[in-house]
């Protein structure tokens, strides 16, 4: 030990000498006192302090060597002491047994209260969880105490206690108990793990424990991703915040208040914005003083309540932050340097701890009582509430009836004997467990004091109450159920008051849908007796077919309608593609079947198509309708056009080859006459003779058309003109041209050929189409009422008038189809296609279409718990005919156990679906020694009085009292809380496991979105919460009004001008203000999350009515900024992470820097434009000078993503998100990017304007300043940090950059010499006149040329004659 401390001393003395010799820096010197001698156990915290002290006073080198020595020291002694960990070091405290025993007792008592219906399921759950949580806490204390007293040098304890490894929660799991676990949904399982890892877990505990472990792993994985993305967004929003100025000179500031008289580290590293004075007016610090820890402590000592400090939030530097507003760079506790990228540092500081924040905590269900103080009575006596006392009944989360104070008052306990009265201060919201005037003993819990009027934000949650036994439901009077209709018209039943719902035991039978009970209510039944009977009937009647049964049911099919096509034989034909079925008529016409036997078809579908070659063409061609032929107008021509009226169809054949090949492959010329079989294009041959037309585009052959017919060269211009274009039909015997007539119908067209113009007479084919298609003969079987079938034949033309069919192969012009028609069917009904043998000739098959009604009949079940045993009988045989409404099968439900049958009341809307049999074991008879004090119909629970001095041992409803015996029908009570949704009505029958009610309860919003990463994200993204709190818009006095329907409340705020602001409060919202309270704008009227946008609006609207626009905007923004910074800090603090305010302020500044222009006034701004507040301010100042109308605007809050996308730099925005949108908009608006931030410069590939690259940036700024050398004579700002630099950096001071070179670049000495020789007055002459104005320099000032100077320079040969 001695040697190392010596070496450390010598080193530190050297370092301090060195420090003394070094020049003292400009900032306040830190304390140079030697470290105080620490006579204590050095644990993690003390080590941290030691290292920090050394770093501050002696720099890095000394500190690192000291840390090294400390490490060696630690290892040396750890080795000698042999600190290791073994199983024997895990000592389980003796107290564990007792603690667990007490917890078990409490829980048993709670379970008993639940069984007796004194508390609801929710209250039971809450109590169990709170009991275990408390036991766990007490066990941790026992563990600490055990180690501290019995084994202070135990390795495990030393590690956890010194902070070297592990923490108390881990030690708790090793030697205390593992505690409660959450299931994957985040609800806590109310079965805790009672053992620890030393004792070992049971199998069940191990499985439950692995839930929690998995949750931890998944959470960590998600958290890293989320936190990384948060950091990326933060960096993007703040990357262009760089310290660019020394002092912006602002007078604006923020105020830091002392918390409990202490500032902690919140002032350290800031600069004061005004003098700080103590109560006597003595100045403690001037403006712009850096506050270091001693100064902060002296403020506390002087009792300063609040200090005004400069902050990045109020800095007026343009698009950056100045050194004095930012304060210390926390890395080395000195004023921040110019060119420091403080935005990036802020983003990393906030993003990095993100991984330490929990994603979501567990839903504890219920609120643990840690934050409230329990007060017990010190004396026995009488309780007296003060005169101002106002209380209301309240039921605690554990189901204890108490009272809640509505105002602050004093409670006194007057002692019954001698002694001093005990006074207790009761605050608003505290719970009282005693009544006014009650006599109490000493050490009784009197009250639970709430920590201030903290109304926590709560959320609605629900829990189902599941029935544990089958039986009949009975409500207690107290419940007072009422029907509530929601917007959709659904009716729900809700409990109005706290009360019990009973389930009286019995055997409940579920009846099938159409079953009728065959026994009356209140009749005795025996085992095996039929209780109810269900019958299944045929709807339409018909012929019965029994199918083979499948599974536990069998199908009865009834043929309702059948139709046979008796003229057609059904033939099967095999082809390579599968089976084809044909229908053949007597005359040999064939129809091809579109379906196969055994399949189903619907109405309007095609059954078969006529296979007819009469309407098949040889090639493609042109369709023309002769007059008289008409088709139905159809929406889609997919299936062709239905023929309305028969007639003649004319067909002009032509052959079309679709080619799409290069023109070089063409082997004929356009307009040429060719014979059949000519090769027109390589490997493509014409099938007919005729005239060729070639279509080509861009040297690609598209089509070749061959039009057949007779070709006549013609010179008659009139005739040629007549048949130009599409051509015309010519009837037989008509003259076409001189000496040319036709004897059959022709289609004539004018064509051009290599030989010259002529007429082409094309043949026309005629097809006759009948008016109607012939229908086959049918035989039909159908019922008197019910569905029936029909067949309809239709003719469909594939093409319409004047349609050109481009094809080489032939096409079918007309299709004749048979369609199925159905009448009076239901949508679910389908038609079955069957193959049926002919009645007379068995070898011939016919096509039959049938409609079947299918009835599923259940098989017998022996005894299924809820249906009893059933017995099913079929009442029909295969092949018989039944009428509509005949019974096909009957099912009987048999009684399982003898007893008394009871039926619930049936209504039209609600037929009997269940019945109950009260068995002997559902009742019990209790005998009493005295006369019973109970009456029939009364419901009692364990412990209620039966007779004098005798209590009941079970729960139920009294059915009979005779002499000294009481007959009780067993039952079970369930407590339901007000506003619960009741799933069953009074008298309903329930099976075990049915839901009885849905309890609606409030639980504290779990620390969840209220904490951790999701909350940080919600704040920084400025998200609008789903159901936000109601905010007060104008200041005033609160008045709470009841709504018209006694349900809703309204808060009225009487404002200063006697106007009344009305705020209706929705159901389920808690009001956070009380009658007569004074409220300010932006104050919360109800609980719930705050919408930050709405808050900003409230602040701004209120301030706008009293202050000028600019001030109102600045103040509203400042209020919101303060709120945001506090909220973000709260989340981090709750998780034990400390971040300096200034980092959050830098980010919040970026979020609140813009305003939205509402009315542009006379400025060039656009309404709706988002623009920096500073820009608007400058614009409006300019307007004020010129007398124009200023722009009106409202401040806006942008989330970090929005803010990143709305930066001035489009390069930065595009590299973040929505690249295309950002770039397109920037291009359309013609934006310029000034490359001010880091990202833009990195993307373009320039030096970044921070750190060492900052000076270059400064020079560019100076270039913008134009040709004024006097600006350059000051030392460039980037090097003002010279004196603050650490000794191990050296920087060469560069020469001041000149604006732009004089033409022949004379040196300063030359110029000076010239001046002296020519007696030029240096003050009058302007040498800058000889500098060329930069091309991009807009300051091309009018500069007077000094003639004398020019002459002198020319004589010296320093200036060319030009």
UniProtKB/Swiss-Prot annotation:
Q: Which residues bind Zn(2+)?
A: 248, 315, 322, 325
- A single GO BP annotation from the record? DNA-templated transcription
Task: From the UniProt entry, list the residue stretches annotated as the region Disordered.
Answer: 1-39, 1316-1336
InterPro entries linked: DNA-dir_RpoC2_beta_pp, DNA-dir_RpoC_beta_prime, RNA_pol_Rpb1_3, RNA_pol_Rpb1_3_sf, RNA_pol_Rpb1_4, RNA_pol_Rpb1_5, Rpb1_funnel_sf
**Compositionally biased tracts (Low complexity):** 15-27
Give the enzyme's EC designation: 2.7.7.6
Write out the GO MF terms. Answer: DNA binding; DNA-directed RNA polymerase activity; zinc ion binding
The organism's superkingdom is given as Bacteria
Cleaved signal peptide residues = none
Taken from the UniProt entry, a GO cellular component term is: DNA-directed RNA polymerase complex
| Enzyme type, top EC level | transferase
Q: Output compositional bias ranges, type Basic residues.
A: 1-14
As cofactor, the record names:
Zn(2+)
Q: Which UniProt keywords apply?
A: DNA-directed RNA polymerase, Metal-binding, Nucleotidyltransferase, Transcription, Transferase, Zinc
* Reactions listed under catalytic activity: RNA(n) + a ribonucleoside 5'-triphosphate = RNA(n+1) + diphosphate
Q: How is the cofactor bound?
A: Binds 1 Zn(2+) ion per subunit.
Give the matching HAMAP family: RNApol_bact_RpoC2
Report the protein's function.
DNA-dependent RNA polymerase catalyzes the transcription of DNA into RNA using the four ribonucleoside triphosphates as substrates.
NCBIfam families in the record, alphabetically? Answer: PRK02597.1 (NF002724), rpoC2_cyan (TIGR02388)
Give the family from UniProt. Belongs to the RNA polymerase beta' chain family. RpoC2 subfamily.
| Subunit-level organization | In cyanobacteria the RNAP catalytic core is composed of 2 alpha, 1 beta, 1 beta', 1 gamma and 1 omega subunit. When a sigma factor is associated with the core the holoenzyme is formed, which can initiate transcription.
- Name-wise, this protein is DNA-directed RNA polymerase subunit beta'
Give the gene that encodes this protein: rpoC2
